[in-house]
Amino acid sequence: LLHHKTDIIFAAFGFNESFAGKEKIPEFKSRLRKYITQTRTRAYNGKKGPKIILISPTPNQNLDNIPAADLNNERLAIFTSAMREVAESEEIGFVDVFSKPYPDGSTINGVHLNEEGYRAFGTALFKGIFNESPEPVNEELRLAVVEKNKQFFRRYRPLNTFYYTGGRKGRYGYLDFLPAMKNFEIMANNRDQSIWSIAKGKETKIKIDDSNVPELPETNQSRGGNKWMSAEDELKLFTIDPRFEVNCFASEEDFPDIACPIQIRWDSKGRLWVACSTTYPHVYPGQEPNDKIVILEDTNGDGKADKSTVWADDLHIPLSFEFGNGGVYVSEEPDFTFLKDTDGDGKADFRSRVLTGFGCEDSHHALHDFVWTPDGKLLFRDSIFLNSQIETPYGPIRVKNSGWFLFEPKTQRLQTFGSYPNTNPWGVTFDKWGHHVASHPIFASTFHATNPPYPTQHPRPSGIQAYSGTCGQEFVDWDTFPKEMQGGFVKVRYKPTNRVEF
């Protein structure tokens, strides 16, 4: 606020707070008054305190299997009235967007607005502030605002903040992460100038000049670079158990789209799906994410892929994915998204942001380990350094410094459990009794418990002590493995050496 010399603050409250119940109204009003008093005393623009306009929550809508309106609107109405009372007594602005009409189907989950819902919200907000109807939208102006917001969001809610403002800021990130943030600020300002030019009639089209954005400094590999080898030469260096054979199913040499693979998964047709990210560790100024999910097929049964299809190519660091509901659930920090091919052409053409607000302070610790539980819920987790705050129709979910999540697609209910400090979240599976076992590089332990009150955590678990980094595991129950290995456990190590162990 100080950096932007803020004159006016639009402050939206009431939705998350409402889940505390109407008995918390006195506390809510007291905290709201305290916020107003403190904010008024800060001259962010260097002259005087900002004007404050409170914005009520929007009404919830009932959807199939998600009775959000029935669950929440009575409480939301009470909290909206409380906000109006505080605004009147403090003599500040207030806009009631709760009691305004919204078309059916204005939300993605009964709670969060879609494009049509935001159009209705924008109209209600404009009328509430200026007491008149807005002019027809200038589409070019709207697109300019969207473009600015995209660049501003990358500065306001960036990935990997633990490396330039958090605990590792003195060791990593300061050479390129901080200059990148500065460049995003410059790019957002450049787009702001284009917005004003269109709004004032000086320009009719978006015209952006980024010539003032400096080049990022060159960086070095502090640990030294890897020695790149062909798949054939790499295979020659493998030490292989004599009971097994290993062949290269697909290589980047033959299929360039599978550069930087993160996760693989086989489908019911015997095709290998691969999530790849060249965007990692995050988007840099002037770039756009173009990560992929690629399908590899062996069409002639020779044990090698001979066909490659890019199923989705505009993803943002897809650390994990899982099939479901005729499509694919994907991790795209801070979002949890759903993709689907609706016309059968072999490429995703439908995309929905199911949930958002997941932590991204360390981008390779974000949502990972997607797997269906035996009772039909989608299980996943995040890891240390992250702070997740997710709004749902059933109330906010908060996790600090790692936690597990369970998601029910039918009702879109999200739960969290078993919060304890754990590191890189790479490896989860179920035994034949339905117990889930998870690994992480430092402790390689498993722990099950309901959550203590946020933000406290359980102590670190005592389990199988780790000996190195781990990045995958599975119980052996495949006929292709030797009989004496059935019922055993396979684990993958990634440091100090790459090994698959039994």
Model-identified regions with their sequence ranges:
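Oxyanion-hole/transition-state-stabilizing segment in secreted/luminal serine hydrolases
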Residues: 1-29, 60, 152, 156-163, ...
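Structural recognition of the beta-strand scaffold that forms the well-ordered cores
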Residues: 7-13, 51-56, 93-96, 112, ...
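Conserved catalytic region of serine esterases and O-acyltransferases that act on ester linkages
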Residues: 47, 105, 109-226
